């Protein structure tokens, strides 16, 4: 019997090794680190020494019957992100002697959760922080939550007459809605609403910029972009507003060049074009007051500070400086007052505060044991594989001859393929085919155990690592909790939240609970590149192995779906105290199976009754005892009240 054990790389694994492996010092933005116990720590804000132990927090939440998978939102990090955004603009305003203010709004579409929006409004109140809405439903949220009469409510999206009427009348409540014209036909609807209501709204225009964008959302600009008015349409809109005596309500220019802009040069070009449009609108007689630079402020998911899709080649301060300086230059060249600057920086505000935690249910990998059979009657193909295996064993502890190893590996693959052909033709039994596959894995493990990382990553050998990798079964639905991983191949930082004093000598990826081959996490950050396998620990018997997915606060909950009927996870809002302790502020309980089924018009009572009728028939036919029927119904009723995830 031959045993193949995972290859340990270091004798004394340190926290520094874990930091290097998972690059937490690069993407963590000082909010996340590893403590002396080998657990992830979460910091109150980037200037604070106050931290809490994330692993300890999750265990204590479990003792409260708040199980994984769960989302933990750190209110202090959310507050710090809002403060950091305003501090950056305040510094830029002071540096460039800008003669107006920055007044941000949060795009509700990034995270519509009530507790989140209430905190954003609370934390942003010193700066009259407002909201941006893109539908009538979001408009109603904004009108209900925004009580500060100095806060702005930017009204974007498609607008029918009712949308416009609601926003217009809300102005009489002391609210500050600005209706942004994004489609040309909205002009007539605004004019009709004004005539019907005898009330006027504040008006803005979204410009369809010609400046090129970058990244996944580059089509947000250009002639074929979904929203915005072309320059000729802007000119005709100004003419129509003048004819309707509404030009004095025209106050804002808005543009948006896409989400998660990675290259600061793209932002600069757009700012220059938009600033000049703002100047021209002023010259055309509009009493302009605001310029809304939209979203696009990116965050550094992979920590490389580059212009890749998962990073940014600029800092928050760089961004604020360029916004302030560019708009100032355009206005001063034309003797125009500096406008109030608005941004819709959703991802940069909300991403860092949310961490998704899940537990590993189990693992699968190729067999680690092999018994070599020396049978003279066995197939020649099998004999060839055995001979290849022994040739590889002879190379153990000898000077590595990489070309020879590659040749032997190619031989092993060819012999395995020959076995498959023979099996299809009926010349090889199922047992022989299984033996051939085990021998091929054995060859792969011999090679892996004899080579270092650089050697095993040779293009002709890299598939060995993939072959030997473990699949870690994750107690979550990717489609529900991190849909961007599936939909657009978004990369989030992923790592264990504990055991960082131990070497993670296994390599693996994650499979979720859904019956879908797309339900896999197999793309991980790797010094600016993407790797398909993550260093992981061997799960311990009867102990949770907990994994964190970081920076998930934007869009994921709104976009998540009910694939295979996995519902909302537990959500917990945490305040970090000054004494390294915490306070649980809010708990939003996970969906039960009954609640999920109700969304699809299934009555739990009807389902149970239908099954009960079946059990009665089975009892009559002597297929089921009364005791078995009762037990089945009891289990179903209990299950309906429980989570859709595996926490029972």
Swiss-Prot record:
Which Pfam families does the record match to this protein?
Arg_decarb_HB, Arg_decarbox_C, Orn_Arg_deC_N
Post-translational modification N6-(pyridoxal phosphate)lysine, affected residues: 109
Query: Which sites bind substrate?
Result: 291-301
- Which pathway or pathways does this protein act in? Amine and polyamine biosynthesis; agmatine biosynthesis; agmatine from L-arginine: step 1/1
| Catalytic activity as recorded in UniProt | L-arginine + H(+) = agmatine + CO2
Which keywords belong to this entry? Decarboxylase, Lyase, Magnesium, Metal-binding, Polyamine biosynthesis, Pyridoxal phosphate, Spermidine biosynthesis
**Would I find Metal-binding among this entry's keywords?**
yes
Which GO molecular function entries does the Swiss-Prot or TrEMBL record give?
arginine decarboxylase activity; metal ion binding
- What biological-process terms (Gene Ontology) are attached? arginine catabolic process; spermidine biosynthetic process
Query: What cofactor is this protein dependent on?
Result: Mg(2+); pyridoxal 5'-phosphate
Give EC number(s), comma-separated: 4.1.1.19
At the top level, the lineage of the source is Bacteria
Is Metal-binding included in the keywords of this UniProt record?
yes
Family in the record: Belongs to the Orn/Lys/Arg decarboxylase class-II family. SpeA subfamily.
Spell out the PANTHER family in the cross-references: ARGININE DECARBOXYLASE (PTHR43295), BIOSYNTHETIC ARGININE DECARBOXYLASE (PTHR43295:SF9)
What does this protein do, in the record's words? Catalyzes the biosynthesis of agmatine from arginine.
Q: What is this protein called?
A: Biosynthetic arginine decarboxylase
């Amino acid at each position: 019997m031959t045993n193949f054990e995972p290859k340990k790389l270091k004798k004394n694994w340190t926290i520094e090794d874990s930091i290097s492996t998972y690059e937490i010092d690069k993407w963590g933005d000082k909010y996340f680190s590893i403590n002396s116990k080998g657990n992830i720590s979460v910091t109150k804000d980037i200037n604070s020494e106050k931290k809490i132990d994330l692993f300890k927090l999750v265990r204590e939440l479990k003792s409260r019957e708040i199980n994984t998978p769960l989302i933990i939102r750190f209110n202090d990090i959310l507050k710090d992100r809002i403060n950091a955004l305003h501090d950056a603009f305040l510094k830029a305003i002071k540096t460039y002697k800008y003669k107006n203010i920055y007044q941000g709004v949060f795009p509700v579409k990034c995270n519509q959760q009530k507790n989140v929006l209430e905190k954003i409004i609370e934390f942003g109140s010193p700066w009259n922080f407002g909201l941006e809405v893109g539908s009538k439903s979001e408009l109603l949220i904004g009108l209900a939550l925004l009580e500060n009469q100095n806060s702005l409510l930017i009204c974007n999206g498609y607008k029918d007459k009712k949308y416009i009427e609601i926003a217009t009348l809300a102005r009489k409540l002391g609210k500050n809605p600005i209706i942004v014209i994004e489609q040309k036909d909205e002009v007539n609807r605004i004019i009709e609403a004004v005539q019907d209501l005898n009330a006027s709204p504040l008006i803005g225009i979204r410009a369809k910029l010609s400046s090129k964008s970058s990244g996944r959302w580059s089509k947000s600009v250009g002639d074929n972009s979904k929203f915005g008015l072309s320059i000729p349409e802007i000119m005709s809109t100004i003419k129509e507003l003048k004819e309707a005596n509404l030009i004095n309500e025209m106050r804002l220019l808005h543009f948006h060049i896409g989400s998660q802009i990675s290259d600061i040069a793209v932002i600069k070009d757009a700012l220059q074009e938009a600033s000049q449009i703002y100047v021209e609108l002023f010259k055309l007689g509009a009493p302009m007051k605001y310029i809304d630079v939209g979203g696009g402020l990116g965050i550094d998911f992979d920590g490389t500070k580059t212009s890749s899709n998962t990073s940014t080649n600029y800092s928050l301060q760089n961004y604020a400086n360029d916004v302030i300086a560019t708009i100032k230059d355009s206005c001063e060249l034309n003797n125009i007052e500096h406008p109030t600057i608005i941004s819709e920086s959703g991802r940069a505000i909300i991403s860092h505060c949310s961490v998704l935690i899940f537990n590993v249910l189990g693992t699968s990998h190729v067999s680690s044991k092999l018994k070599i059979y020396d049978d003279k009657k066995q197939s020649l193909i099998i004999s060839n594989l055995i001979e290849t295996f022994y040739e590889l064993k002879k190379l153990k502890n000898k000077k590595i001859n990489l070309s020879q190893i590659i040749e032997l590996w190619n031989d092993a693959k060819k012999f395995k393929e020959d076995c498959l052909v023979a099996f299809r033709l009926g010349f090889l039994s199922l047992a022989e085919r299984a033996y051939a596959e085990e021998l091929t894995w054995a060859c792969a493990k011999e090679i892996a155990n004899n080579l270092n990382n650089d050697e095993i990553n040779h293009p002709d050998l890299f598939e060995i690592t993939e072959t030997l990798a473990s699949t870690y079964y994750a107690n979550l639905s990717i489609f529900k909790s991190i849909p961007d991983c599936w939909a657009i191949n978004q990369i989030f930082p992923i790592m264990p939240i504990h055991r960082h004093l131990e070497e993670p000598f296994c390599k693996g990826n994650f499979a979720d609970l859904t019956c879908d081959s797309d339900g896999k996490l197999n793309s991980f950050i790797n010094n600016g590149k993407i790797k398909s396998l993550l260093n992981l620990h061997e799960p311990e018997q009867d102990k949770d192995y907990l994994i964190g997915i970081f920076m998930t606060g934007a869009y994921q909950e709104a976009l998540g779906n009910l694939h295979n009927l996995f519902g909302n996870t537990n959500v917990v809002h945490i305040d970090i105290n000054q004494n390294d302790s915490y306070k649980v502020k809010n708990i939003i309980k996970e969906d039960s199976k009954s609640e999920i089924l109700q969304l699809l018009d299934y009555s739990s009572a009807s389902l149970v009754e239908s099954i009960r009728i079946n059990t009665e028939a089975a009892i009559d036919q002597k297929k089921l005892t009364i005791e078995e029927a009762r037990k089945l119904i009891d289990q179903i009723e209990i299950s309906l009240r429980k989570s859709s995830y595996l926490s029972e």
